[in-house]
Amino acid sequence: MRSLIISLNFNPGHVSHMLASYKQCEDLGYESVYYVNKKFVPFLPQKSNLSLFGGDNCPKADLAIFLFPSEKNLPLIWKLKRKGTKIVYIFHEPLAPLSVYKNAGFSTKYLARLWVIDHISALTVKWSDMVLIPSHKAVKYYEENSLYKNKNYYYLPLMYSDEREQRHKQLLKKNFSYIGTVAADHSFQEFLEFVEWAVENNRLKAYNFLIATKSEFVVPDSLRNHHRVFIHKGQPMTDEEINRYYASSFAIWNAYARTTQSGVLAKSFMFGTPAIVLRKNMNEFTHDGANVVVIDNNQDKEQIVNALKRIADNIDSFSSECRKEFEKSFYYKVYNNLFRTI
């Protein structure tokens, strides 16, 4: 049996998800093959089975797993189904009501783009044999959206392989970090303003601040070349770079204005790193005082400081609980039997 792990739009943040599906299919007896945009090649494990998307190339397979939306998915699904391939779509982000995105600060232009992406996703959903949805909130949005016609859907949390190795455990957890895309709903500006304030007022003196993103942004003058601030911006990161950033953090910014299911949260738990989250975004994976600390206002700097102190004072306990949640909810092997049956 052969499985294709498919991601046609390049995003290095997708590698962890792809790796988990690749390994899971191998565990279940498939010959796994990455079928991807060529830009992924340097970011994928060496000696992996690999086939590059392009032209009329359409490999034969028993199973094809599409991990992310793309207009390129649609003709490929059509070709694969003609060959008898079973299509599975891991639907990370069913569209919330547009008012949710507007309230989070997205522009009208971006809302129009979301509308287009959603209609492409709806066709991918319709043509798939099975749809996997990663959170209770995502299931709710899926069930409320009349565009999503496929009734053969299942709740299955985001899956990861365990990428934490001994070298990661040895890193000092010294950073409060923002990791991921700069986006309005991720409240990046609030994080940046907090870091400026903390540096200028010499708060949290024992700790440093990290921003790791492929996005571009203007670095405030007060943070340029500051010894307490490390910034990686404007270029993709390898999976190993991303992993080191998580492993060297004692807390992760997840106090987003809006989130359906955060891959940042899951990956921070992989490395035993707790997160700061907004109360309104608490979900089935987060437990205040155990693997996250809840705040009510991501602009309240003293509230953020108190949350970080709570984590720092109990880091061993928080880290242990994060690992437990990762192993229970996000480790792909937990779902091997379920995936086999559905």
Where do the PLM segments sit?
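Membrane-proximal helix-turn-helix segments that form the acceptor-binding/catalytic region
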Residues: 110-131
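Active-site proximal beta-strand in glycosyltransferases
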Residues: 63-65, 80-104
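A charged, aromatic-enriched C-terminal amphipathic alpha-helix characteristic of glycosyltransferases
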Residues: 299-302, 312-342
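Donor nucleotide-sugar binding/catalytic pocket of nucleotide-sugar-dependent glycosyltransferases
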Residues: 126-165
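Nucleotide-activated donor-binding/catalytic signature segment of Leloir-type glycosyltransferases, i.e.
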Residues: 219-244, 289
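Acidic donor-binding loop of glycosyltransferase active sites
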Residues: 244-260, 273
